[in-house]
Amino acid sequence: MRALFLKDAETAPAIQTVEDSAAGAADAVVSLRAAGLNHRELWIAKGQYPGMTLPATLGADGAGVVETVGSDGDQALSGQEVVLYPGLGWGDDLRFPSAGFGLLGMPGPGNIAESIAVPADNLFPKPTHLDFAQAAALPLAGLTAWRGLTTKAGLREGEALL
């Protein structure tokens, strides 16, 4: 498949042919219709993102259609339009991520590609009032905003922010 691939910090990202990401029993394969770009991809390309292992397929935000679902996943997802939640292994404490937390594109393959295998639990219905490009722009920005409000600003249920 084709994907936005970064060989090293000295080479510009380029569209290349890469192997399909391996899907496990709890995964779903999503055919991407749109992927969002974040400043994170620029930092990665400049070698300024800590913990990044190169070479890598870039991208954390995306929306598409579920192609297949692994044997342990919800088969009703097949054919559904979805948004990818980019967080992997947040843990049980909503205030901060676990030590094993990661994002799509770090350490595994990113989603600026024709398709990606992700945990089926990381898929959410695409809002019908959004097209794929609009939906793809939401996940990581939304997670960043939510975390800023809840963990940094300390906003709690029942409180409001203006």
Identify the residue ranges that each predicted region occupies.
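Nucleotide donor/acceptor-binding cores
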Residues: 1, 80, 158-161
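NAD(P)H dinucleotide-binding glycine-rich loop of Rossmann-like/cofactor-binding domains
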Residues: 86-162
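Glycine-rich beta-strand-centered segment in the early N-terminal region that forms part
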Residues: 21-35, 48-91, 107-110, 117, ...
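Exposed loop/turn and edge beta-strand positions of beta-sandwich/beta-sheet ligand-binding modules
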Residues: 14, 26, 60, 97, ...
